[in-house]
C-alpha cells in the first residue's frame, strides 16, 4: 500500500467527562467544609463525625494541632475514635486502634503493629489510613474533602476568613440536623421569599408588614452577595441595634451563609454552616459574634429567637 493510500490514523478518544450529579444527589468535592468548633476538640480526645458519608476522626494533639483521619482501621475496620491518643516508639503522637493496638500517626501513617516480631521485617509505614487536611482559624475547624481519596496533595487555597468575628467568644451557638440532602438545605438558606410566612414573629416582622423591595446582588469568590444595604424597616430585630445598621449577606459554596451587620463601629456576624453528613442528613450550625453591648442585655431572648428560626426552617425542609 502506497503512502498516499495508507489509512488515516484513528482519532484518539478521550474519556467522557463525568456527568454532573442531579440536584439532591452527590456532593461538591475538592473544597473546604465546616467540620467543628475549635472548642469541641480537646487535646488528646478522639471524636467521630460523619461528613459526606465518610466516617471521620477529628482530634487535637497534645501540642494543640487539629487533625483528621478516616475513622476506620484498615486491619479489621474498628473505629479508631474508640481508641486513644498515645505515643509510638519514636515519640510521635499516634492514635491507637482499640482492637489490636495498631498505631497511626496523625498524618495517617502506621508506625507500629504490636503483634509483629522483628524477624518478619514488615515495613508497617506502607500501611496508611486516609488523612483529611484540616485548617483551624477564628475558632472554626474546616476539613478538605478531596475527590481523590488517595491524593496527598495539599489544598490549593485556605478556608474562608469571615468579617465581624469580634467580641470574644460567640454569643450564640446552635446546631440541628435536617433530614434532607444538602442541596435542599442550601436552597432554604438562599430563599428570600419564605421569611414572611415561615418566620412571621411579633418581634421580627409580621405577615401584614410585607412590601415590595429590591436588593442588589454581586458576585463573590465561589458565590455571591446581597451587597451592603439598609435592612428592612419593618424588622424589629434590627431596630434594637439602634443607629443606622447596614447589612451584607454572602453565600459561598459548598454551604456557607453569613450576614455581616455594622452599626457605626459595632459589628454583628451571623454565620450559618451546612455540613453534609450523608445523602439524607445535613448538619446545620449557627454561630453569632458581636461586640454590640445590647447582646449583654438580650442574650437569652436572642438565643431563643434564633433557635426558633432554625427549627422553623427544619420543619419546612
What are these regions, as identified by a protein language model?
Residues 2-23, 37-165:
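Rieske [2Fe-2S] iron-sulfur-binding domain
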Residues 3-5, 65, 77, 149-317:
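C-terminal catalytic domain of Rieske-type non-heme iron oxygenases
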Residues 28-35:
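A short helix->beta-strand "capping" segment at the edge of beta-propeller domains
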Residues 29, 128, 135-137, 268, ...:
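A short, structural micro-pattern
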Residues 30, 100, 142, 200-202, ...:
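Short, low-complexity intrinsically disordered segments
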Amino acid at each position: 500500500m502506497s503512502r498516499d493510500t495508507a489509512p488515516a490514523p484513528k482519532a484518539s478518544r478521550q474519556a467522557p467527562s463525568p456527568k454532573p450529579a442531579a440536584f439532591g444527589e452527590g456532593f461538591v468535592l475538592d473544597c473546604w467544609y465546616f467540620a467543628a468548633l475549635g472548642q469541641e476538640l480537646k487535646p488528646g480526645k478522639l471524636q467521630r463525625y460523619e461528613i459526606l458519608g465518610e466516617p471521620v476522626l477529628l482530634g487535637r494533639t497534645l501540642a494543640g494541632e487539629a487533625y483528621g483521619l478516616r475513622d476506620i482501621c484498615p486491619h479489621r475496620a474498628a473505629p479508631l475514635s474508640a481508641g486513644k491518643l498515645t505515643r509510638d516508639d519514636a515519640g510521635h503522637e499516634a492514635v491507637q486502634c482499640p482492637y489490636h493496638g495498631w498505631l497511626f500517626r496523625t498524618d495517617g501513617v502506621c508506625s507500629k503493629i504490636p503483634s509483629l516480631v522483628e524477624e518478619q521485617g514488615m515495613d508497617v509505614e506502607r500501611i496508611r489510613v486516609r488523612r483529611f487536611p484540616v485548617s483551624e482559624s477564628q475558632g472554626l475547624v474546616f476539613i478538605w474533602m478531596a475527590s481523590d481519596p488517595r491524593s496527598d496533595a495539599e489544598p490549593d487555597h485556605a478556608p474562608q476568613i469571615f468579617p465581624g468575628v469580634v467580641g470574644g467568644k460567640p454569643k450564640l451557638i446552635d446546631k440541628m440536623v435536617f433530614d434532607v440532602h444538602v442541596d435542599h438545605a442550601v436552597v432554604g438558606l438562599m430563599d428570600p421569599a419564605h421569611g414572611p410566612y415561615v418566620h412571621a414573629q411579633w418581634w421580627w416582622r409580621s405577615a401584614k408588614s410585607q412590601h415590595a423591595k429590591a436588593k442588589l446582588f454581586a458576585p463573590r469568590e465561589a458565590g455571591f452577595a446581597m451587597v451592603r444595604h439598609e435592612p428592612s424597616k419593618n424588622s424589629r430585630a434590627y431596630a434594637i441595634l439602634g443607629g443606622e445598621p447596614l447589612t451584607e449577606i454572602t453565600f459561598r459554596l459548598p454551604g456557607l451563609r453569613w450576614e455581616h451587620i455594622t452599626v457605626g463601629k459595632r459589628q454583628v456576624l451571623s454565620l450559618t454552616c451546612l455540613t453534609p453528613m450523608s445523602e439524607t442528613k445535613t448538619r446545620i450550625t449557627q454561630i453569632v459574634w458581636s461586640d454590640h453591648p445590647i447582646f449583654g442585655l438580650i442574650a437569652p431572648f436572642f438565643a431563643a429567637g434564633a433557635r426558633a428560626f432554625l427549627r422553623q426552617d427544619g420543619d419546612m425542609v
